[in-house]
Structures are given as C-alpha cells and as structure tokens.
C-alpha cells in the first residue's frame, strides 16, 4: 500500500497484476504510457513522435479498439504533464467530428450577423492561444475524422500547412470574417479577420472505416503520415511485456523536443533531401528505384513526398538508437507511399506485385509461399513492414477484386 501523498508521475500501472506500483520519473514517453495502463509498442510511439515532428499532421487508422484515440490523447497529456486542468484545456482540443460538417465552421466557428459577434469554437480558441505562446506546443485531436468529408471541412488547414516556405514560414492565413473589429461571443476578446495556423499546433486525426464514413482522397493522404493500428498480440498483452524492439529513441524524454529548435522548421524542403543524401547517399538509389517502378503506372509520388520522407530520415538519424536507413525507409514507405493505393485488380495487381518484389534485396518469385512469409513479417525482406502490408493488400485483391491500404 502506498502511504501519504504520491504524485501521479511516481506511479505506474502493472498490467499483469492490474495494480498500480511505484515507478521512477515519468519523463520517459514509454514509461508514461505504461503508467496510464495502455499497451503500445515502443516502435509505434517512436513513429508517432517522429511523424508529428516531421509534419504536424498525422492520421491514425486501424481496427476499432486498438487505442488510436488514446495514443494521441496520452501523448498530448505527456507533453503537458504538470499543468493545471485549466491550462491543459487551453493546450489540448479534443474534437468529435460531426457527419453534417460541410465546411470549416465546425472547426473555426462563424460570424453571426444577428448579434454581430463571432461564435468561437474550441479549436479557434486554441489557435488564438497558440499564436500568443509560440514556445508551447498545442494539440488538436480530430476523433473519427472521416465521419465527414475531410476535403470539405479541413481543406483550408491542409492548404495553409502546405503554403509554408523558408521565406514565409507562417504560410498563408485563414479567412475568418470581414466585419472589422469583432468580439467573440464568449466574451474572451476580439477575433481577427485573418489568422495564421501557428507552427506550434499539432493535428492528429483518427479514422474508422465502415458504412457511415468516407474514404480519404489521395490529396489528403499525400499530406500526412498515416500510421496503422492492426497488430494485436495477446501473449505480450497478457504478460505486459514487449518483444525486443529496434526502432526506439536514444533519449525517451521528448517533452521538450517536439517544437522545432532554433535551426529547424515544421515543414519540409529540398534541403531535407540534400541533408538525407549527405547522411547516407544510398537514399537516392532507394527512392529512384521506387519512383521508376511506380512511374510505369502513373502511381509515382512528387517532390513533397521526397522532401517529407527525407525530413523523417533526418529526424530518425538524430533521435533513434542504432539508426538503420532501410528500417527508416521501410516505415516511410508504409506511412507515406502505400496509403494512397486503392483500386481494382486490373489497376493494382501488377504494381503491387512489383512493389512487394522491391521489398526484397534479391530477385524473388511472387507466389503463395512468398506472400505467406511476407504476411507473417518476413525478416529476410529488406522492407518487412511494407512487404507485410502489401501481402495483405494483394490477398484482398485476389479474394475481393479490390484493395485499399485503409481498411
């Protein structure tokens, strides 16, 4: 029994015994999730952190009940730990997307001509607050993001994030109203006519796929890292212990590492590609070979993806223990290249088979035996994560005549 007053940061949840026990500091991100009683692989948490740091928009997809929403909520709480409930409320906006959203009013509010005031939303209040405190990270979590068409209510945000450049890092501005001096309906001050999305705001959208949701367009998927949650390991879950993992952070205390440093930016550019090539010239050949495969089917990617993959590689090189280029590229193929693939057997059968062959170093024959090995995570592949997903997509193509990365 724990006596006296104990800080939450000194407690940790033991999933095997279903008890709370004493732990060390909750500075480390992996320990913090454990203390909350949630089981996520270290690789998954590392990928989420690096994805946010590479670009402040991440999509989490996968089967229901795997913790997509919780990984985003707990990460935001981890960064904001030690703050009062009121302060956390200003820094974190949890938004349940409504199926009737046809424009950005659900996120940004609107000017009401009747009372001549601006009706402010939680997200707009957070954006205004973040603009006043650029040294603090803020989080917007869009739960069930695809209950409405993302292109309709979130397109302004996507366009503005893409408009950031070296000479204009703030990007273009959101249009809010044209009514001059306008007070907020909640009485908390003025609302400007135009507002830049602060670079210290991080967006995460969770996705479920059923008959009530919409699929994403390539335009949306091209602008995010997509992390899939489908792996459920009951044996590890029961023991509360993970298998040895390789993609882990050098320093798991990332509370002050999310915001860009003095020489960093929250957008990608050609400089990231140049920096990645300096770190490992092999990245050119890997990406060029991949482009040559996909170009045959007009499924190739553009310079934005090249820059963002390179940015992720540079971040991983700086922060991941025992950096391995093939491992990092495997993760980026899985998160940046494959999510846009969906279509019929006639469209995707040949390119998907060529892609899974690309995931192996040596020349391979694509048959049922290889697909079975790849589906079980084949360590002989140079890109085993991507090969595993491709094997599933090819199987769906053969059985259903149609496949999609997001399922």
List the model feature ranges, each with a label.
Residues 6-16, 22-23, 242-407:
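Alpha-helical lid/collar subdomain of P-loop NTPases
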Residues 4-257:
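AAA+ P-loop NTPase catalytic core and its hallmark functional loops
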